[in-house]
């Protein structure tokens, strides 16, 4: 927890990030650490344009993509951009929960020949909704090694959804929070139609306890560079619960 509380000062380090020029204005790629990149895609929800963030890792075997661009119209542009920059193909895709901004690319990546993964819980939800599913599934927690690169998928508990997981890159000390972590500029909890707000706080604490030495947190939407996102998420949950209590 101590490491997470000190993340604010690290925001200054983002001024040196390398931003790549993309042909598609709805895709932005920024280098975060060594071979780890944050990609941001944009889409419209209920008339408002939002940014969705995720990451990809360039390994000696190929590229590992966490989640997917938000919208089918961006899939090919995204993979073309990766090949143009790195000369490598996507070999693995992992969805951090069942929503389209995370699992929407499973079918596309699978057709490219990439190994696609999700938790069994996410797979069950996708099956019920008759949506494309990952080829491989696993229980809530799993460690991966691709070439020389190691990373871990961790299920902290319910929050934004029942099935949300985070991804930890230990060498770079980067936590991909997905949608269970709200950005520092979020005004509220966002879409909570499938949320478990009463469980969310404990799930965030589980993340803090599991990964006490995080240096960078990539929130699922909007400004991922604001490293107050973990604490801000807790604050937003508390505010929501207080409002609910006052209205009852």
Swiss-Prot record:
Annotated EC: 3.5.2.6
Superkingdom of this protein's organism: Bacteria
Signal peptide boundaries: 1-21
Binding site for Zn(2+) 1: 97, 99, 160
Record key words, sorted: Antibiotic resistance, Hydrolase, Metal-binding, Periplasm, Signal, Zinc
Residue ranges that the Swiss-Prot or TrEMBL entry lists as coiled coil: none
Key word Coiled coil present: no
EC top class, as a word: hydrolase
Catalytic activity entry: a beta-lactam + H2O = a substituted beta-amino acid
SMART domains named among the record's database cross-references: Lactamase_B
Subcellular location: Periplasm
Binding site for substrate: 182
One GO MF term: zinc ion binding
Location, primary (coarse class): periplasm
Cofactor note: Binds 2 Zn(2+) ions per subunit.
Pfam families assigned: Lactamase_B (PF00753)
Positions of Zn(2+) 2 binding: 101, 179, 221
Necessary cofactors: Zn(2+)
PANTHER family, per database record: ACYL-COENZYME A THIOESTERASE MBLAC2, METALLO-BETA-LACTAMASE DOMAIN-CONTAINING
Description of how the protein assembles with itself and partners: Monomer.
Family: Belongs to the metallo-beta-lactamase superfamily. Class-B beta-lactamase family.
Role played: Confers resistance to the different beta-lactams antibiotics (penicillin, cephalosporin and carbapenem) via the hydrolysis of the beta-lactam ring.
Protein name: Metallo-beta-lactamase type 2
Organism: Elizabethkingia meningoseptica (Chryseobacterium meningosepticum)
Gene: blaB8
């Amino acid at each position: 927890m101590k490491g997470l509380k000190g993340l604010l000062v690290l925001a200054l380090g983002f001024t040196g990030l390398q931003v790549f020029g993309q042909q598609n204005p709805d895709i932005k790629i920024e280098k975060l650490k060594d071979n780890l990149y944050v990609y941001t895609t944009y889409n419209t929800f209920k008339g408002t344009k939002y940014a969705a963030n995720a990451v990809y890792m360039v390994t000696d075997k190929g590229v590992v993509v966490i989640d997917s661009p938000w919208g089918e119209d961006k899939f090919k542009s995204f993979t073309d951009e990766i090949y143009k920059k790195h000369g490598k193909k996507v070999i693995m895709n992992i969805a951090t929960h069942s929503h389209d901004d995370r699992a929407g690319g499973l079918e596309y990546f699978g057709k490219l020949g990439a190994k696609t993964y999700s938790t069994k819980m996410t797979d069950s939800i996708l099956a019920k909704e008759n949506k494309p599913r990952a080829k491989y599934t696993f229980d809530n927690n799993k460690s991966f090694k691709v070439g020389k690169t190691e990373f871990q998928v961790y299920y902290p508990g319910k929050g934004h959804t029942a099935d949300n997981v985070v991804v930890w890159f230990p060498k770079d000390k980067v936590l991909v929070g997905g949608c269970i972590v709200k950005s520092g500029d979020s005004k509220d909890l966002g879409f909570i139609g499938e949320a478990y707000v009463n469980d969310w706080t404990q799930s965030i604490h589980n993340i803090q306890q599991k990964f006490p030495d995080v240096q960078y947190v990539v929130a699922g939407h909007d400004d991922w560079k604001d490293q107050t996102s973990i604490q801000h998420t807790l604050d937003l949950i508390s505010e929501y619960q207080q409002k609910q209590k006052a209205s009852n």
